[in-house]
A protein has these predicted regions:
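Cytosolic juxtamembrane helix and N-cap/initiation of the first transmembrane helix
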Residues: 2-32, 145-162
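Alpha-helical transmembrane segments of integral membrane proteins
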Residues: 19-29, 55-62, 81-88, 130-140
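C-terminal TM-helix exit segments that contain a strictly Trp-centered aromatic cap at the helix terminus
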Residues: 33-42, 92-111
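Core segments of alpha-helical transmembrane spans in multipass integral membrane proteins
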Residues: 33-35, 55-75
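Membrane-interface interhelical loops and short amphipathic "cap" helices
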Residues: 37-55, 110-124
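Individual transmembrane alpha-helices with interfacial aromatic-anchor signatures
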Residues: 119-145
């Protein structure tokens, strides 16, 4: 009797398929577009309310784009870590929007005050209009979708239950 012990089932697949990579790219692009819409909304508010933009805010904007760009890049390159990168990116983006615009960084630490200018306080304290709120909600929802999609793909990838 000759039994092979290290035989793996044929349906065990740890690599993401075309469908999963395509969905990760799509949600990353949607997230980047919503973030661009969000930043353009900041410019609209600056023009209407005569706020000033401090140069340090551009650093914050740059840092905010890094997770979504990384998630898109990993999906574009068809990396085995694309789902993990998408999950981390979604969490970072959701936390960033929540901390910056719902809680307000002035409640967390005065360190952020010089970086964020007028946006150191929450949206409610800024008396943001409906357009800004809808924009913020769209960004947070896209982050939640990125988290859920990436988590689903990552769990299926790690357990070998990925249907490609």
């Amino acid at each position: 009797m000759n039994h092979v012990l290290d035989e793996t089932p044929t349906n065990l697949n740890y690599q993401l398929g075309n469908k999963q990579f395509r969905l990760l790219k799509i949600i990353s692009i949607i997230s980047l577009l919503f973030m661009l819409w969000h930043d353009l909304d900041h410019l609209r508010v600056v023009m209407h309310r005569s706020y000033s933009i401090v140069p340090q805010q551009f650093v914050t904007v740059f840092i905010a784009y890094v997770p979504a760009i990384a998630a898109f890049y990993m999906a574009y390159k068809r990396s085995a870590y694309a789902a993990l990168t998408g999950l981390i990116a979604g969490i970072l983006l959701l936390m960033g929007f929540f901390l910056l615009h719902i809680i307000g960084t002035s409640a967390i630490s005065p360190i952020f005050d010089s970086f964020l200018g007028a946006w150191k306080v929450p949206f409610a304290a800024l008396h943001s209009d409906l357009f800004s709120w809808l924009n913020l909600i769209a960004n947070m929802v896209s982050s939640v979708v990125m988290i859920m999609l990436s988590f689903h793909f990552l769990a299926a990838q790690l357990t070998g239950r990925l249907k490609v």
